[in-house]
UniProtKB/Swiss-Prot annotation:
Biological process (GO), any one: translation
Record-level Gene Ontology MF annotations: rRNA binding; structural constituent of ribosome
Keywords linked to the UniProt accession: Ribonucleoprotein, Ribosomal protein, RNA-binding, rRNA-binding
Subunit annotation: Part of the 50S ribosomal subunit.
Organism: Mesorhizobium japonicum (strain LMG 29417 / CECT 9101 / MAFF 303099) (Mesorhizobium loti (strain MAFF 303099))
Name of the gene encoding the protein in the UniProt record: rpmE
Top-rank taxon, per record: Bacteria
Name of the protein this chain belongs to: Large ribosomal subunit protein bL31
GO CC term, one of those recorded: ribonucleoprotein complex
Summary of the function given for this chain in its UniProt record: Binds the 23S rRNA.
Pfam families per the UniProt record, alphabetical: Ribosomal_L31
Length: 73
């Protein structure tokens, strides 16, 4: 395996939407960083089997709906 071509693999803390925290190894961020999830397996409709409404984080969903409201799909 070639050296110095792979990203740094380190420990981070992941915080799920319900506040549950766990530690994992990742290439995301830096050692000791915290990743706060907007959606996770406990809230995503694909894993819960429900038709939950997704939270509009940062206005993206509202912007999309406003942009395409006249199409009548």
């Amino acid at each position: 395996m070639k050296s110095a071509i792979h990203p740094d693999y380190h420990t981070i803390k992941v915080v799920m939407t319900d506040g549950t925290e766990y530690t994992t190894r990742s290439t995301w961020g830096k050692e000791g960083d915290t990743m706060n999830l907007d959606i996770d397996p406990t809230t995503h409709p694909a894993w819960t089997g429900g038709q939950q409404t997704l939270l509009d984080r940062g206005g993206r969903l509202s912007k999309f709906k406003k942009r395409f409201e006249g199409f009548g799909l």
